[in-house]
Amino acid sequence: VSPMAIQGPKSDDVVASVFGDWVRELKYFWFRESSIEGIPVVVARSGWSKQGGYEIYLLDGSQGTRLWEIFREAGKPWDIGPGNPNLTERIESGLLSWGGDTDEKTNPFEVRMGKYMDLDLSDEVIGIEALQKIHAEGPRRHQLGLIMEEEEPMRPGFVWNDIMFEGNKIGDLTNNVWSRRLEKNI
C-alpha cells in the first residue's frame, strides 16, 4: 500500500473535487474504498496535521505517478501543491507517531486513545483481558506534553532520552522540537 497525504485547511475542498462530497462526511480515522479514473484507493480521514486532512492509500503501486498528477492538478484552483510533514505542528497538536512516541510496551490508555477502545469484545480477542484490567486499574504511565526550560533550540526529532529527577528516572522524552510559536523547546 502506498499512502499519499492531502492535509491542511483546503484538504476538504481538494479531495471532494476528486472524489465527491461524500468525503466531507467521513469521520476522523474512518475510511472508504473508492477509485479514481480506475485507480483503486482507500480514502481515510486522517493524517499528521491539526488542520485536518486525508490519506489516500494507493492499492496499485504502479499508478502512483498518475495519482500524484491527479491531485497536483486538483490543488491548482486553491493554489496549493506538494509539501512535507510538519514536525512542530504534529507535536504541538499532540498527534502520535508509532515508534516515535510509542513502542510495543505502550497501551492506548497511556496515550489518550482509550476512548477509541471497545472493551466489550469477546474473551477470544487477543489482549482484551489485559486492556480491560488496565482500564479498570488505570495506566501506570501517562504521556504528556512538556515545555522545557532549555533556552537554546534543541535538535529536533525522535530521541527516547531518560527524564531524570533527583537521580531517578521518572519518564522518557520521546520527541522534541523548538516551537517558534511558544519560543520554547517542547
Describe the role of every protein-language-model region:
Residues V1-I186:
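Conserved, structured C-terminal
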